[in-house]
Amino acid sequence: LKVSVIIPACNEADSLLPVIKEVQKMKPFEIIVVVNGSSDTTKEIAEGAGCRVVYYEEALGINIGRAIGAKKAKGDILLFLDGDIAVPHEELMKYTKAIETGHDIALNNLSWIMKRKVRPHPVSVAKYMLNLCLQREDLSIQALTAIPHAIKKTSAAKIGYENLAHPPLAHTIALLKGMSIVAPCSSDVIYTNKIRTTHKTIPTNSPFPISTNYIIGDHIQALAHLIEEKGIRGGLTDGDRNREVVSAYTPNVKRKTGVKYSAVIPAGEEKETIANVIKEVKKAGVEEIIVVANGADEVTVKRAIEAGATVLHYKQRLGHNVPRAIGAMYSSGEVCLFVDGDIVISAEHLRPYLEAADQGVDVALNNLECLLDEVHPIHSVSAAKYFLNIVCKRPDLTINTTTAIPHAIKRDVMEKVGYESLIIPPLFQLKSIMYGFMVQPVHFVDVARTNRIRKEHMKVKGLAASTQRILGDYVEAMAYYISQTSERGEFLPDIRRHDLLFEVLNNE
């Protein structure tokens, strides 16, 4: 099979020749250098080295050069590189070999980045989140965003050359088409990458540099495509949630007046813990305690009543977070504290949430940020939480969301955002931020180690059922966000020269 090597280059006079020299050792069919926006001798160097040069006076914008090179290439295998990073030819051969043995795409294996004892970069979080939503956790952060990578020419045509200008979108299309993607080699392009102005310049409406902004926008666009193809949960399970019960539910009692704090406690078979959970909530100063018993045994219900709670009784399990919404609708307090029936949390660890609400915090979250420094690589659910906060331009919230208990929410937030959104915790959080409410982590309670291991937490093949459901919640939140903003969210618009790419696509 013939190999075409594609190298987009802009002002790479200092670094291009070593890149070309390594490539020439592979004896490829052709080396295409797409020179664009260059004011130095990049073009002359490429021509002098015997490369096929495609020249544009203007800068094309990131990845447009790749797509143009791919369309113009005559080989059977397309190998993509950058003009500023020389990769040993022995490594490059591993990418082309993977295509020769029948795979469609061969990616650079960068999963080692996630194992370092540091917090993941927002771009790594976005890459991991996309692979998780595509149910390919095994791909970690492997992506078409990173070089080197190789694609079979016929597969590139099926993906669409125009889509190669958006690597996360191309990656998504490839997986949805059932293409075979592998990561046969680990080439270090992180420590060798040139720091550019776009890596440092931060636009006014964002906490992220320009390059990060673009890449996150590209990942939102890829998720928009997944949602369009697979529905608002991206094809991920909703668990056994009974959503109808919430829309049909209107409390037939009038709200009590003068109640400051309510607590909502969903409970299944929690006879061992329920009485102590209620006792601590009372001790924290909560006046109204509502236990939403769903699929609960009689002992749990009896103990909840004896402990002084109001019990709303449903014979069937309602599914995750549905009881939260029902309990919140029934409750009367100005502030609602959410805890679970199977984790006993002492009053001293519950009070900070109520106090934060008194001091002006609208949504007071459990501060689990320390897990970012303790768990490497980041857990899939934590990655989804972090991604949501990155999309909301609140990276300061890290992995803190209303998915984790305990948390406290003010009544006016629930009234404005809508009680039914409590069924999908990330959607509730996203809406709260979009409405301008103050969302803050306030106190750490270790719920990770005390959480009961249930059957749905077990991995059988691919993702555990609980992980799939939680990821689906985050995709659903993203679907709402995209519907309210754009296919790139509120990240930098795409100003790349697609017009010049389409000229090539239409003329060749």
Please report, for each region that a protein language model flagged, where it lies by residue.
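Short aromatic/hydrophobic "clamp" motif used to bind/position activated sugar donors
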Residues: L78, C336
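The conserved acidic donor/metal-binding loop of glycosyltransferases
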Residues: D82-V87, D340-I345
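N-proximal low-complexity "stem/linker" segments adjacent to membrane-targeting elements
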Residues: L1-E22, L236-K279
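Conserved nucleotide-sugar donor-binding
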Residues: K74-G75, K127, L144-G160, S332-G333, ...
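C-terminal catalytic/acceptor-binding lobe
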Residues: L176-G258, M434-E508
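Short, flexible, basic/aromatic active-site loop/helix in glycosyltransferases
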Residues: H103-I113, P120-Q142, D362-L372, H379-N400
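Glycine-rich, basic loop-to-helix element that forms the pyrophosphate-binding segment
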Residues: Y56-A73, K315-S331
